[in-house]
């Protein structure tokens, strides 16, 4: 059996996963600035919440994974601090909008209408003071944490800890999300009826 003591994933899951609250309808995200923070309203429950090991997602200090979920873009509104937001990489499929002062990614948006996830915005629910958001369901792009400097010898224990938390580790997205991407592509190519 692999020793997982001391393995930290992300502060929002390290001490167990909080369940979603039935009927939860969203809340407000805020950056880490002590004065004039960026505030973003999310007026719906999130979906497909997961921890992500990719090197593009924002992670809190000391975390080896981010925690990210999606919500319909029509449910997201920047309330305050829009002038402080900048796009991290305009060429990336997910245009991550971060606070230029503290560096926190407030939301990610896909502008390409042909992208399988167009219409969904990516958010970090730990930036909210409200409880009740959808619970993380899986771990994505797990091997990518090596690219950010995690020693490969730690991977067995990290995957074991993810499983202890109920977060099945994948080196892509979860099977239902990968199926959604493949279905979108097959319909666009004509391999499946649209």
UniProtKB/Swiss-Prot annotation:
InterPro entries, A to Z: CENP-V/GFA, Formald_GSH, Mss4-like_sf
Cofactors named for this entry: Zn(2+)
Domain CENP-V/GFA as annotated: residue spans: 24-171
Keyword Zinc included in the entry's annotation: yes
Reaction equation(s) it catalyzes: S-(hydroxymethyl)glutathione = glutathione + formaldehyde
Single GO MF descriptor: zinc ion binding
Note on how the cofactor is bound: Binds 2 Zn(2+) ions per subunit.
Pfam families found in the cross-reference section: GFA (PF04828)
NCBIfam families for the chain: formald_GSH, PRK05417.1
Known function: Catalyzes the condensation of formaldehyde and glutathione to S-hydroxymethylglutathione.
Entry protein name: Glutathione-dependent formaldehyde-activating enzyme
Primary gene name: gfa
